[in-house]
Each structure stands twice: as structure tokens, then as C-alpha cells.
Amino acid sequence: MKVPLSAFSTYSTVNRMTGEQQLIIWHNGEKRVVKSPRTHKYYMHDKKGREYKVLGKSTTQLLREYNVENLGELRPESISPLSKIDGLTRNEVERVCIEHPNFFTEFESREPTSLGFDLEVTSADGSFPSGPQHPIVAVGIVTDDGQRKTILWDGKDDKELIIKFAEFVKNYDPDIIYGYNLIGYDIPQLFARAGHHNINLRPYLNRDNHETYGWESDFSYHKKSKVETWGRLIVDVYNFASRDYALAGLSKRLKDVSRFYGLKPIELDFNLNDILDYDLDTINEYVLSDCDATKYLFNHYFTQHKYIAEVLKVPLETYMNSADSFITKILQGRALFKRNILTFDKNNERHPEIESFQAAHIDLYSPGFHRYNYKVDFASMYPSIALALNLGPDTTRILRYEDYDIGKFGCESADSGLYMILTIPDNVLDKNVIIRVDLKDKSCLYKMCKQFKEMREPYKRMGGHEAKSKSNGLKIMVNTFYGANTNPYMSYGDIAVGLAITGIARWLILGAKNIVQKRYGDDAVVYIHTDGVNTNCDIDVEWINDELRNAMTSLFPLSESEWISVDKDEFKEGFWIAIGNYVLRNLDNSLTKHGSTFKSRSRSQFYVKVLNKLIDARLDNTVNQDFIKDIYNFENYEVDDFLQSRTMNQNIGDYKNENDLVVQLATKAKAEGQKVKIGSSFYYYKTNGGVELEGNVDSIDDIDIKYHWNIISNLLQKFDLTQWINKKPPITALDRKQQSLLEFV
């Protein structure tokens, strides 16, 4: 690995003899303490000072520079409240990454060793097994060197199990500990049970036997994204899956994600059973199956993230535990630092008048069924606009605002060719935003986008998982610039970049729409979303590219219009329900689903089955009386198909309405002796008498048929099949005894 595992530095990591700021760096499984390469400084306004460029300022600022010995001397209480710190941060590792880009490459490390684990926990009282009262039955372990191991409890107590697991981690000494939802569940549950037995796990799980550092966790259920440790990196594979666009609209349960990627994980029924209802051999196979699936997914995702850290030249842990804006923060921060442009404020401080602005263009022009579907897809639209117009925080700034007039959209180019003035009408601001773009030097965004696009090309042509991971990693790096520059809390970027990109993107996408309609007719355009135009006819993308580039050159004479390009995606049948809600059949007959109608995470199997039948019939154009009779036939469904779920995301007292469904379910669960808390999941049925928890409904006769009948009717309406709706269920559907009587007669 071309970078170290992690780096750490705070006010306290100072050499007491010399006063030097130090960094603690972990690589090759060992700790190194080295001197920070930075010169620590702050600035004060001074009429006799030097001239400095400051981001967002139209003129240079007179400032005096003051050097100090270490980070501690930059504490707020140690310097004047009028002083300024470049980047507004006292994060030492971040500033080393920015000011000394190659520093951490001096600490190359071996390929990181890893250990994955999964807990199986028994419920002490029938509630969801989270908390100190619920013992751990088994811990499954997998390692990068091929070990597969299960530690089982002795049938009475899990104290010995916990100690054995902790000792295994200590002896194996992995660089990375990973699991699936381990931050939201496994780690807090492990520490809850360890606390129950008065065991301090930190000396085992931290390196250096550190007794107090890190491992702060709670049952956050995906609300907490990281856990810090001493000398190791914690990776929650769930966080990878939750950002995987390939899984859009799908459940992110480990079993579901595993099956999506071709695995066959073992399933056990926990609807009515506890883990201890199964024998130890079954538990052993089950927990190792989960560990194997998690290891596969870890290896699948990790390659990409390690590569990004290496390209950024930052410690692996620093990148992995960072916010989405980190890539842009580091790269733009480096560019600004190299050009001696200081950053003293955040976006929302530079532009307090901008609380929000006009978004990308989205519209549905022709809802319903379309037999043929093609998409004009802009290639890396936002980065391409930045390239074409030389946009970047170091070249782009807002000059002023004028009255809103969409007819004034465009550009004035200086005769010298050294800058251009963009006019971006914005209907949310109700202003025309006048933006200056300097052209004397290439912007940092231009250089970085160009570099990463060139780096990506060979990987796009190569096969294999590693090449695909690196290609996707570079794509992520290119596509993060836009969001980061519009982030109100970003210091190393400017919202002028985002405003310009979004405004020109709207012009381009509507231009593509007009070009398509001009040649193929007004009815050819079905849907527009940000960077794509969906059509119902085949299209000539080369002609569209020529038209767009000619328009770009005409309106923006100093632009590099060759960066703007579109590709063509082809689909089979498709159905468009509403903006953001559609389904398309791909050429390989798989489906692309988008929108709330098609999300099935909390839906019942009844809903999913009805929806899937409707999709197939609507796209195949096979809806007829027999199909409608079948879809309304409740004999096709079993009682378990009607099971739904809800999760309690706040304390009961915080819900505003006592009739809220979650409050009803929690009240029933408490009445049955279950302990309910934030994160508790309730599985329930909608019955004739209201809602009932799982286990209290045995027959489909108890199910509220009218409620589920209306679900079918509503879906038929969404798919433009109103004429096929049966408004009321017959008496024989509501009461199966009537059906039996009818059959008898």
C-alpha cells in the first residue's frame, strides 16, 4: 500500500523538549512518531503587511504573518480573536495532506491485514436482542490469511466467549477490523456485554494495549458512520453497500446484498424462533456464512477505496473516516495553497445571501408506457462543464446580482481573452447572478478533472475487478467536486462554481431536448433528469454532439466545447409513473427501477408480488381480464406475505401523535412484555381489527382484505390501468366462509 494505515496528531502530540509538533503514524503494523513538516502560522490584518490573495475577495488583502511553534499555540485562547487561520482548521493531519502532498507517501505500508467478525445474540426477553441483558451466543471470525473460526458460548454465560474473541484479535493483530453493520450493532453489543461482565476490551482491541482510547459507540442503526481505535481501522461494510448505486431501490440487508452479488447465504427463520432454537452446528454454519458473505463484500468494495487513498496520497484511515467532501477539500485545498490563495471563511460566510439556488432541470413530458426507450446521456456532465469553461474556486467568483431575466442568460468575453462574464438567471434567488471566470491560467478543477479522466481511460478498457474498481474510484473523485463547491460549510471551494455549473447544465439539457424535438418531433422526449434526456425513438448522438458543441462555441466563444459530449443508452420497454418514478427493461431483460413506488425495503411481500406481476404484464402488454382476476385473487397469497415492518427512530414520547403507527406497535409490544427502544423493529399485520404484531395472526381470514385490495387498485391506477380497477372486493373475498357456502350451494 502506497500510504500508511493512519496518522494522528492533536494539541497534545508535542515534543515537550523541543516544542515540535509530532505525528503518530501507523504503518506495517507499527507506530512511528515523526516531526510534522508544517510551519504553523496565523494572519492578522495590517496596513503595513504584505499583499495576499484571499478566496472570494476581488482585491488582495494586507496581512501580517505570524509563525508559532506548534498546533497548541494556535488554540483560540492563545491567539487574538481577530486572527485568521488558513483553511479555518486546526486539523493537523488534514493540513499536512494539503501543504505537503507527498509527505505520507514516505510511509508506504504492507497490504493491510484484516479480520471480519459477526455476532449472534439471543434475546433474553423476546425483544430485539440489543443491550447488556442479551447474551452473545456465537462470534464468527474470518481473516485475510484464510482462517474461519467460530467461538461458541458454553450454554450458560458469554464471558469466556468475549475474552477468547478479544484475545484472538489481540494475537492476530489486524490492521483492519470489519463487519456488516458492526458500528450500529456488533460493536455496541460486544461492549454492552463486556460491560455487563466488567471487562475492559480496549487493551485487547487497541494496539499498544491502550486502555482508554476510542471505541465510542451506541446502537445508532446507521446514524453513526465511524468508530475510532488506536492503531487500527474499523470498516463497516454496510456503509459501502448503502452508497452502491447498483443496489438502488433494494434492501441493504446482508443477505439481500449478498444474493445480488451471486452469493448463497444461509437463511434461518427468526420470525418465531430465537437463535438458541437451533443446534450449535447450525449456528456455527450460519454465523460463518454471514462472515463469508461480509468478507466477499469487503474485498469487493475495499479495492476502490484503498486506490482513492493512494491517489490522494493520504493515510487510509483519514480518507475512510472522512466526509463526502474530503476528496475535494484536499485537492482544491492543495491547489489554493500552491497558488498562495488563503481561505479565511466558509461558503455561507462569503455568500450569506445564498441560502439555496435553482436546481438541475427535471421534468416528465410523456408519462405512461413506451415500447422503445433511448437515453441521451451526458458524459460526466458537471466535470465536463467545469473543463469547458475553466471553472474552479481559483478562477470563478460572483461579481454582483441583477434583476431576474432568463433572456439574458449567456456570456460576455473580454477582447483580451483573459476572462469572461457569465450571466446565470436563477429563479430561486430571483436574480441574475453575474460571475467572472478568469482564463489566464487553467483552474485547479480543470487540471484535476483532465488528469483523472486521462487516468481513467485505460482502466475503462481493461477487464477485471481491480480495473473496474480503480475506474469507479477515479469517477467518484471527478464527480465529488460539484457537491463540495456548493456545500455551505466548505472553505476550500466557492458556490460560484456550483451556480455556474448548474445554470449551464440546465441550458445544455434543455438544448438537447430542443435538438431532439427539432429532428424527431415534439413527442419524442419522454423525461429529463439532470444530465439525461429519455426519448421514445432512436437518436443520432453524433449529430446531437455536433449541435451542442456548435451552440456552446456560439454562446461561449472562449470555451473548450470539445469537452461536452453525450452517449446513447438503449432500453426495451418502459413505464413512467411520475417524476422520479419509472421502470425500464434493460437489453438483458433485467429491470432498472427508480422511485418510491419501486422501493421494497419496508413493503410487505404482498406488495412486492403484486408490483412485480404488474411490471411484467404492463411491459409485456398482457393485461387482460384473466390477469386482473388473478392479481385480485387472494388465494394466491399466504399469511406471511402480508407481514410489514416499521422501526422506532425516536423515543415514544417524542412522537407527536399517539395514534402514530409506531406508537401503536410499541404499545402493543410493551404490553406483551417486550422492551422497546430506539431502533426496535416491529413486524405486524394490518387486520380487520387494526394492527397486530407478528405471532398473533395465524390465518388469512384475519387480514384486512379491503386495505390490501386498495393497494392493488392504487398500483393499477399508477400504471394507467384505471379501467381495470375493481373498486370493491366481493363478499366472498372479505369472508371466506361465504366462498365455502357459495361452493356448497
Tell me the role of every PLM-derived stretch.
Residues M1-D173, I199, S289, K295-A309, ...:
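DnaQ-like (DEDDh/DEDDy) 3′-5′ exonuclease domain used for proofreading
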Residues K2-P4, K149-G249:
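Conserved DEDDh/DEDDy metal-dependent 3′-5′ exonuclease domain
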Residues F117, V235-D236, G368-Y382, F452, ...:
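Conserved catalytic palm subdomain of right-hand nucleotidyl-transferase polymerases, strongest
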Residues Y172-D186, L190, W230-F326:
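Acidic, Mg2+-coordinating catalytic module of metal-dependent nucleases/exonucleases
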Residues D175-L182, D523-Y527, N534-N536:
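Short glycine-rich phosphate-binding loop at a beta-alpha junction
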Residues D186-H196, A379-P393:
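Short active-site loop/helix that positions an aromatic residue
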Residues N271-N390, L399, A467-I515, Y527-I528, ...:
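Common nucleic-acid-contacting/processivity interface regions adjacent to the catalytic cores
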Residues S471, E542-V745:
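C-terminal, non-catalytic extensions of nucleic-acid polymerases
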